[in-house]
Amino acid sequence: MGNGGRSGLQQGKGNVDGVAATPTAASASCQYRCIECNQEAKELYRDYNHGVLKITICKSCQKPVDKYIEYDPVIILINAILCKAQAYRHILFNTQINIHGKLCIFCLLCEAYLRWWQLQDSNQNTAPDDLIRYAKEWDFYRMFAIAALEQTAYFIGIFTFLWVERPMTAKKKPNFILLLKALLLSSYGKLLLIPAVIWEHDYTSVCLKLIKVFVLTSNFQAIRVTLNINRKLSFLAVLSGLLLESIMVYFFQSMEWDVGSDYAIFKSQDF
């Protein structure tokens, strides 16, 4: 999530005017957001001649609009891991990151691999090698489809709640496309599933639960920052998504489909 932390400063150089606004600021009068107070801003910095740069001060809170444009991407990533609202605003509003789809696919592959690994670990097959190889490959595709359906149900639950509560979620019409991108980006914690599987130990199941909690916390912060809503509504939105996802898991298990994961918080025996 931390890529592009210095892109604003790098792109602004090379303008020949006396004072140059930030990139594309002319085409979008209020493209950016102050990371402190969430107020809209026309630019992040001004580029004077001879490479003299000055960070824009927010007119509302009198603080720098985005201090992170001077930070190293690693620092931004650490702040994002700590779920700081300022880091989330920088990433979501003041940078151009187009890896949402790729990150989503990769996270689903990680989750599918975890489920597939647990499924193979619990099954003992005596069939011929070719048949076993084909069955294992099919199981991986099935785990990927189940993980995708569960994530879709989770997102639908969140969007449904926010749509019902939209008069309370924002003063203006909420940008659900931006929210979807924010949810996909904030699910990056699922990448930790692979190390948890590779370095297997007695506490792997606990680690998987902690990863799940971390992803949910990141989603919670992404919803709160994107829509500028209070913690209660953001928490209820995540809870609604979890509820619909749990119903989907229960449906799969009632159909006697092994979802093959300890990663899910709710299982059939919980109902």
Swiss-Prot record:
One GO term (biological process): regulation of plasma membrane sterol distribution
Membrane topology: Multi-pass membrane protein
Residue ranges of the TM segments: 144-164, 176-196, 233-253
Alphabetic keyword roster: Cholesterol metabolism, Disease variant, Endoplasmic reticulum, Epilepsy, Lipid metabolism, Lipid transport, Membrane, Steroid metabolism, Sterol metabolism, Transmembrane, Transmembrane helix, Transport
Tissue: Ubiquitous. Highly expressed in liver and adipose.
Location(s), subcellular: Endoplasmic reticulum membrane
The keyword Hydrolase belongs to this UniProt entry's keyword annotation: no
GO molecular function: sterol transfer activity
Pfam families tied to this protein: Arv1 (PF04161)
Reported impact of residue 189 to R: In DEE38; loss of protein stability; yeast complementation assays show that the variant does partially rescue cell growth
Keyword Membrane included in the entry's annotation: yes
One Gene Ontology cellular component: Golgi apparatus
Chief site of localization: endoplasmic reticulum
Superkingdom of origin organism: Eukaryota
Disease: Developmental and epileptic encephalopathy 38: A form of epileptic encephalopathy, a heterogeneous group of severe early-onset epilepsies characterized by refractory seizures, neurodevelopmental impairment, and poor prognosis. Development is normal prior to seizure onset, after which cognitive and motor delays become apparent. DEE38 inheritance is autosomal recessive.
Function summary: Plays a role as a mediator in the endoplasmic reticulum (ER) cholesterol and bile acid homeostasis. Participates in sterol transport out of the ER and distribution into plasma membranes.
Note: When transfected in S.cerevisiae, it can complement the absence of yeast of ARV1 protein, suggesting a conserved role in sphingolipid metabolism.
Family per record: Belongs to the ARV1 family.
Entry protein name: Protein ARV1
Organism: Homo sapiens (Human)
Origin organism lineage: Eukaryota, Metazoa, Chordata, Craniata, Vertebrata
